[in-house]
């Protein structure tokens, strides 16, 4: 498991959550 993958996954999840909750 690479820290880079975790960072990218967290970034993607944040964008998705932002879009869904509309709390950017």
From Swiss-Prot:
Role of this protein: Antibacterial activity against Gram-positive bacterium S.aureus and Gram-negative bacterium E.coli. Has activity against C.albicans.
Disulfide bonds: 18-24
GO cellular component terms, semicolon-separated: extracellular region
GO biological process: defense response to bacterium; defense response to fungus; killing of cells of another organism
Family per record: Belongs to the frog skin active peptide (FSAP) family. Brevinin subfamily.
Subcellular location: Secreted
Expression tissues: Expressed by the skin glands.
UniProt key word tRNA processing: no
Keywords: Amphibian defense peptide, Antibiotic, Antimicrobial, Disulfide bond, Fungicide, Secreted
Name by which UniProt lists this protein: Brevinin-1Pd
Natural source organism: Lithobates pipiens (Northern leopard frog)
Keyword Disulfide bond: yes
